[in-house]
Amino acid sequence: MSVAVLAFGLNHTSAPVSVRERVSMPVDLVKPALEGLRATFGGAVREAAILSTCNRTELYCAAEGQVAEHLPAWLAEHNRLEAAALRPHLYRHQHDDAVRHAFRVASGLDSMVLGEPQILGQMKDAVRAANEAGALGTLLHQLFQRTFSVAKEVRSQTAIGAHSVSMAAAAVRLAERVFGQLEDARTLFIGAGEMIELCATHFAAQRPRSMVVANRTIERAETLAGRFSAQTMKLADLTERLAEFDVIVSCTASSLPILGLGMVERATRQRRHRPMVMIDLAVPRDIEPEVGRLDDVYLYSVDDLGRLVQSGTDARRAAVVQAEAIIETRVQGFMHWMQSREVVPVIRDLHQAADDVRAAELERARRMLARGESPEAVLEQLAHGLTQKYLHGPLAALNRSEGDERRQLLAWVPRLFPGRDSRR
């Protein structure tokens, strides 16, 4: 049975953060998810990889049969959701559409921030996790290697990454909307990953009054804080110290909210209702959405920042056209490679059949020589036997055919035996 490439999932355009956070998969859960997927579908899912970020959860797989029809139910069951509630937010791509989607994602064309570079690293992490789980094979390995190559080509030959308004820069803009200049702002960063590092870089450029990094692992917090002359604190101290901060930016891998309504409500009272800007870049969310109902709190989710960064995409629209052209060419190249793989078993069988004929005729020739027959007669018989057996299949097919089938076979004769036309 033939194997197809599938890309399946949801992203920031098809699902709000309230849905995305429910199917988000931390790195440590990707391996068991892949194992569960392959156990569910058996050999029908040959290869698989899961890409899960703040803005998307996608499954890439090499699969056979009707697997694609059952993936929504699997994803819903895996995350303990109702399939009917999840299905409207899902998309599915197959064959060349799946390849095109992978190329566009890695190139930043499908990102909330058009042209953002982080997605390429996230996709490489996803491939590494799939490989460590033993879920990658020749097909997806080749797909992702070409995906990374295409992304590099797009970035080097177009301006897709230029004029980018990043999520980190958008976070600064949102804080400035409330406080104006940030010189007097006390800023807290919760987490110590790449996104927090980017945000800290942008906020540090505004020279806020203070910057503090809180993280579950204090050593990582100290490493990040050292870059910006910031202080550190333990997550356990958030309850006591939250009221100190004017701006809170959070992005952790926690599966449960870190800042709840009660904690923030107490902090606003301690602040005597001075405003707080809270920017939640995590999926699943670090801050309970109910916090946004408090009068003195300006809560922004990753989707809110996404709407802000869209204003910076106009200057890159021309680059998108160039990028799409590059991607289309590379998609066709990959599909040609896939089709050539389908021919390989046929070519192998043809070679084996020809070798079997050759071996049989050689053995016959050796027996004739052993009986003392003349070499000339043996060579004549060998050539005749090879010719008859090699042509038996094509001639039998021609004799059995009729109508359009015969015309098609006759049209192929000059291509299969290219010297034929010149002898007419």
Curated annotation (Swiss-Prot):
UniProt keyword list: NADP, Oxidoreductase, Porphyrin biosynthesis
- Keyword GTP-binding included in the entry's annotation: no
Which residues are involved in binding NADP(+)?
A: 191-196
Amino-acid positions noted as binding substrate in the UniProt annotation, renumbered to this chain: 53-56, 111, 116-118, 122
Record field: catalytic activity: (S)-4-amino-5-oxopentanoate + tRNA(Glu) + NADP(+) = L-glutamyl-tRNA(Glu) + NADPH + H(+)
EC class name? oxidoreductase
- Entry-linked SUPFAM superfamilies: Glutamyl tRNA-reductase catalytic, N-terminal domain, Glutamyl tRNA-reductase dimerization domain, NAD(P)-binding Rossmann-fold domains
Q: Does the keyword NADP apply?
A: yes
Any GO MF annotation of the entry: NADP binding
Q: In which pathway does it act?
A: Porphyrin-containing compound metabolism; protoporphyrin-IX biosynthesis; 5-aminolevulinate from L-glutamyl-tRNA(Glu): step 1/2
So what EC number does this one have? 1.2.1.70
Q: Which domain of life is it from?
A: Bacteria
What is said about the domains?
Possesses an unusual extended V-shaped dimeric structure with each monomer consisting of three distinct domains arranged along a curved 'spinal' alpha-helix. The N-terminal catalytic domain specifically recognizes the glutamate moiety of the substrate. The second domain is the NADPH-binding domain, and the third C-terminal domain is responsible for dimerization.
Query: Which protein family is named in the record?
Result: Belongs to the glutamyl-tRNA reductase family.
What's the stated role of this polypeptide?
A: Catalyzes the NADPH-dependent reduction of glutamyl-tRNA(Glu) to glutamate 1-semialdehyde (GSA).
The UniProt record's further free-text remark is:
During catalysis, the active site Cys acts as a nucleophile attacking the alpha-carbonyl group of tRNA-bound glutamate with the formation of a thioester intermediate between enzyme and glutamate, and the concomitant release of tRNA(Glu). The thioester intermediate is finally reduced by direct hydride transfer from NADPH, to form the product GSA.
Q: What is this protein called?
A: Glutamyl-tRNA reductase
Q: Which organism is it from?
A: Bordetella parapertussis (strain 12822 / ATCC BAA-587 / NCTC 13253)
> The organism's lineage?
Bacteria, Pseudomonadati, Pseudomonadota, Betaproteobacteria, Burkholderiales
